[in-house]
Regions:
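Active-site and donor-binding regions of nucleotide-sugar-utilizing enzymes
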Residues: 24-163
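Membrane-proximal basic amphipathic "stem/tether" segments
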Residues: 1-29
Length: 163
């Protein structure tokens, strides 16, 4: 059964890459769904069939016919997913993109971070936690100011910051 599941997930990842969806959300587990749900619902209504919800948690799904749910597990399959995924906009709540095991790839046009807490970007995250994102959905001016300050002092590429 494990071998069968592995190949089923592998096949699903390759299907996503062939489709090259407009919007893809990655979730580590179902506890993160509440933070992106409204964005997902809005995009699914506006772009039916173009929104994918990918999770490492088999129980993490969105009950919306316009959202395509895919379980990808973790470990090797998660690594394979992130190195091969081809999508226009990839939404995540994972920090430290490109600084940890999750690396950017050339097939993603726009890496988008959305917060799962209304906290300062300088208090609980690593200093480079958001450096490699293209777009960040911020909770307020304080996050925008903190990110812009870091971009300036570290001479980083400017991100699109949305409040």
């Amino acid at each position: 059964k494990k071998i069968k599941d592995f190949f089923f997930i592998f096949k699903n990842i390759n299907r996503i890459n062939q489709k090259k969806p407009k919007y893809l959300f990655y979730s580590e587990n179902k506890s993160y769904l509440k933070f992106g749900y409204l964005i997902i619902e809005y995009l699914a209504k506006k772009f039916p069939g173009e929104v994918y919800y990918i999770s490492s948690d088999v129980d993490d799904k969105i009950n919306n016919l316009d959202v395509i749910n895919v379980h990808i597990s973790s470990g090797f399959l998660l690594q394979y997913f992130f190195t091969s995924v081809s999508v226009e906009n990839l939404f995540m709540t994972l920090t430290d993109l490109n600084n940890s095991i999750i690396k950017k790839n050339k097939f993603v046009k726009n890496y988008i971070y959305y917060f799962h807490g209304a906290v300062s970007t300088t208090k609980i995250y690593t200093s480079a936690a958001f450096d490699n994102y293209d777009t960040i959905l911020c909770n307020g001016d304080y996050q925008i100011n903190e990110i812009q300050h870091r971009e300036k002092i570290e001479n980083l590429k400017k991100k699109k910051l949305i409040k």
